[in-house]
Amino acid sequence: MTEPSTLAELEEKVRESIGVRLFTVLAWIPARRALHRAHSSHPEQYPVGGEKTVEVAAGWLDRCIEAKEPYFGPNPAAVREIFADHELIESLHCGSIINVPVLGEGDVVLGVLNILDAEDSYDDESISVARSLAPLAAPALRELVARLSVQGSRT
């Protein structure tokens, strides 16, 4: 099992430090090139356990997963350019996004924090703060990735 209280506590730390309307934590499953939702502030719209494979533009995967760098979309145009679910994102009054990779031992990508708020809510300082908080998700994601990898090898 993941540690939902840990991820919920991380959500609160993000809320207190930079603000957030929509917060999800996704585990990276390399064997399937899929992102598996481990935590969601909006479980009706973004249910825990949901997976994304082709919803995200290749440039985003190159940046966040391959290069292990944050993605920053300051406004709705940037969100629309990258995310297929931009209409749902906009319906939640989110127009600015920070995606931060969560790294494990050996700089292996364990997953991604998705932090969204109103347009122009974030800046370079927000990205730095988000990066500093990302390691707090590593224990829960490490456990989830290991469990999902074992399940995937049995199918």
Q: What feature does the model see in each segment?
A:
Residues Q45-E81, E90-H93:
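Regulatory sensory and allosteric helical modules in signal-transduction proteins
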Residues L103-D117:
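Sensory-domain boundary capping and coupling elements
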Residues L7, D117-T155:
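Juxtadomain coupling helices with adjacent low-complexity linkers
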Residues L22, H86, N99, V112:
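Short hydrophobic/aromatic beta-strand element in the GNAT-like acyltransferase core
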Residues S96-L103:
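A short, aliphatic-rich beta-strand micro-motif
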Residues T2-V25:
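Amphipathic alpha-helical coiled-coil segments that mediate homodimerization
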